[in-house]
C-alpha cells in the first residue's frame, strides 16, 4: 500500500520552482502527494482530514517558524496517522526559539533538529493484567469483592453501646484558666455600671442609643395652653439645651422671648402651668 504525503507550503515558497522541486524529490516515487497552501489552512478555508497522511512536509522560506507553522501544528498533528512525521524544509538557517515549545504543546515529539523532524506518538492501548498474590497464584475475584464488602460493612456498622467521650473532661484546670475572656466594663462596688474609656463590650453603644432615644422623646413634647410640664426635666437630661439656662431664677435672668416672663421664680422640679402665664402676658401687652 502506497504512503500518502501532504506538502504544506507558503505562497512565496511555491513561486520558486526550483525550491519546490527539491521538496518533491524528498517524496518516494510511489507515494501519493497532496499540496496545500499554509495561509489557506490558517484561515480555515481548507480543513485537513483526520488521520489521513503518513507524513507531512512543511516548506517555508523564512525563519519565523512559530508565526507561520505554529497556528497549523495542531491541525497537522491530527491529519497524520499515529507514528506519522512532520518534516520542516526551510531556506532559512534555523527555527526561532519558540518553535520547539509550540511543537511540544501541540503534541509532537522532536525526533531531530537537523533537519527538523517531528513525530506523532503511537496510540497507547490498555492491556488487562491478571492480579496475583505473593505466591504467584491468581487472586480470586470473589475473594477481592468479599474483602471490599467486609471493609464496607465494618465502616457502616457501628457499636451503638459505645460510650461517648465528653470533650470538656479532656481539659485540665490550667486550660480553663487560659480561656480568652471578653473584656467587660465592671464598675467598682456600689457604683452604677458605665462604659469605660476604651469600651469594647458594646455598653457604650447601648448608652448612646438610650440617650438619643430619651432626647428624641423630649424634643417631641409640644407646649399647649393647658400643658403642665416639669421645666427642669429637660435640663436634667444629658443632652438638654437651653438658651439661657436660668428661666427658673426669675425675670431678671430670663430672655426677652421666654414664656415664663411675668411669673415668679420657681424651684427646679416645680410643676408650672403655662395657661396662667399666658393670661398675664396678654394683660401686660394690653397695658403696653
UniProtKB/Swiss-Prot annotation:
What residue intervals hold the motif Cx2C motif 1? Answer: 244-247
Q: What does the record give under GO molecular function?
A: 2 iron, 2 sulfur cluster binding; 4 iron, 4 sulfur cluster binding; electron transfer activity; metal ion binding
Q: Where is this region: Fe-S binding site B?
A: 244-258
Q: Highest taxon of the source? A: Eukaryota
Stretch list, region Fe-S binding site A:
185-201
Residues given in the record as [2Fe-2S] cluster binding sites: 185, 196, 199, 201
Ranges where the record places region Linker: 128-177
Per UniProt, the short sequence motif Cx2C motif 2 occupies residue numbers 255-258
This protein's GO cellular component annotations are: cytoplasm; cytosol; mitochondrial intermembrane space; nucleus
Q: Which region is the signal sequence?
A: none
The record's keywords, sorted A to Z, are:
2Fe-2S, 4Fe-4S, Cytoplasm, Iron, Iron-sulfur, Metal-binding, Mitochondrion
> Which cofactor does this sequence's record say it needs?
[2Fe-2S] cluster; [4Fe-4S] cluster
Q: Where in the cell is it found?
A: Cytoplasm; Mitochondrion intermembrane space
Q: Which GO terms describe its biological process?
A: [4Fe-4S] cluster assembly; iron-sulfur cluster assembly
What's the main place this protein lives? cytoplasm
Q: How does it assemble?
A: Monomer. Interacts with tah18. Interacts with tim40.
Q: What is this protein called?
A: Fe-S cluster assembly protein dre2
Annotated source species: Schizosaccharomyces pombe (strain 972 / ATCC 24843)
